[in-house]
Amino acid sequence: MVDAISMFKRPAFAVFMICSCLVCIPLAYYYSFTSNYLRSVGFTQAASTMTIGQMSEIFFMLLIPFFFRKLGVKNMILIGMLAWVLRYLLFAFGAEEQVIWMILFGIALHGICYDFFFVTGFMYTDKIAPKSIRSQAQSMLVFFTQGIGLYIGYKVAGDKFSSVVKESDAALNTAMAGIGSQDELSTGEQLAQMFSVNDLSEVDSNILSTAMSKWNEFWIYPAIMAG
């Protein structure tokens, strides 16, 4: 990876690498706390709901060659970065009134968020790196994104969750105890309920409102950072 550091002499690559690292800081918010968020909003099978993102990722992965020709590397990376901002804003503003379509749309954006930024970024790195250091350049990109970026991100996101959401979310989870089916489900049954949301009308409105307000505040932070 030492030889690949010389690529930082190229301003465009240096900007790309720094931006990639910075984008991965708010990315940790999504990876760490989306499941908690979905359960608090009322989704019965949060893990299954998040597979919408993986489905979207596969779909857009197949379309990358098409968009690569039509849009080019820079536009695709820019769209990917903007998609991250939009996702966090959808989560933030979908929280207070539990607007389900906004939350689902935010999850479905994963294909654009990941493929347009990260996959295209790897393709860009592979394209501009000299053949002799191509593997080192790819390793350096992983180090800056999934290494430095996510490490900082998990620390920042964890601290923010503890200071903003943790207390009110714990109160909400206690109030939600017993709501919905408690039966054990097979994997297929869990996937079939990826869109299912519990009715939270029986939950104390003050507890629910406070928790959702805190989730709104929580998701605003990564939206600002990604912007």
Please describe what each predicted stretch is.
Residues 82-96:
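C-terminal ends and interior cores of transmembrane alpha-helices
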Residues 116-130:
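Intracellular juxtamembrane helix-capping segments at the cytosolic ends
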Residues 21, 87, 100-117:
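Hydrophobic core of transmembrane alpha-helices in multi-pass small-molecule transporters
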Residues 44, 129-142:
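Loop-to-transmembrane helix entry/capping segments in MFS-fold secondary transporters
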Residues 216-227:
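Symmetry-related core transmembrane helices of the 12-TM Major Facilitator Superfamily/SLC fold
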Residues 12-19, 23-41, 45-50, 118, ...:
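Helix-loop boundary and gating motifs at the non-cytosolic
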